[in-house]
């Protein structure tokens, strides 16, 4: 067991922190912390358990320390989940992960709001103090600063979703572009030169697709097919014999309508595809850069919030010490006044007895 005269100041030793987490890790406490919003009685019970273990820690100190650890864990968890650089250092990460992982799955919004824990912590401290007590005006400026900050990780989550949507839209556009080119390259049956346009479809065939039967497409029938000639005979004009198309160019894939060989795409189509690919790569790089910058900014904001919370907790501890010293001084003064009053009454009684005895004599 740790020393009984442990410091009740600002710094927490590793043994104290480990003891606090082991107490909060019990099923009774962690369930009450997740289900009860006003949990002052929970931290009172935790403070009593800490005193039984030999550490003098008040309810507010236990609450503030757990809030700081939760904010550090949430920062490291988000950095690890989004893979934005190296995750920040978080002491007791494994223990906190066992305590808070279930809360992330069941109630993520409540845990994300703990990123701005300083504001809520100060409000709980003010609500728990009786009106008229000393030391409540010390944290007014810190509450104003903490109130200006919004929940940090909601912003990170929204920006990450926006980046993912933009990336998926670009990938979908590229996929549609490739599909339209593939369909257009294999749709026409004629060997004539296709007419190209700048519409959403890369190019359209000059001749309508062949509507022959599957047997004709497979080349089983010996009859001539419209797809094997470049033009049709016109009435009144002698038709010239057409040379049969080689099997390498007329053959089709079994089970499909696309020919085995197709003409390569034109140069402008290749240039356009390369330009689209370069644009997508540049936008992806820009999105990654913006996401890294946003992550750094949010980490800085969270660090400032944690520093504000620690300073507020330190000032609250100082105010509690001053109030405790004042109460002790008032009690000592009251005891001294009572002793002086008793001595005065005793002397007065003796004086009266002497006067009475002199009068009788």
Curated annotation (Swiss-Prot):
Q: Where is this region: Disordered?
A: 174-198, 217-272
Which intervals carry biased composition (Polar residues)? 187-198, 226-249
Family matches, as InterPro entries: Myb_DNA-bind_4
- Which Gene3D superfamilies does the protein's record reference? Homeodomain-like (1.10.10.60)
Tell me the ranges covered by the Myb-like domain, including all copies: 11-70
A Pfam family hit: Myb_DNA-bind_4
Protein name, per record: Myb/SANT-like DNA-binding domain-containing protein 7
Q: From what organism does this protein derive?
A: Homo sapiens
Primary gene name? MSANTD7
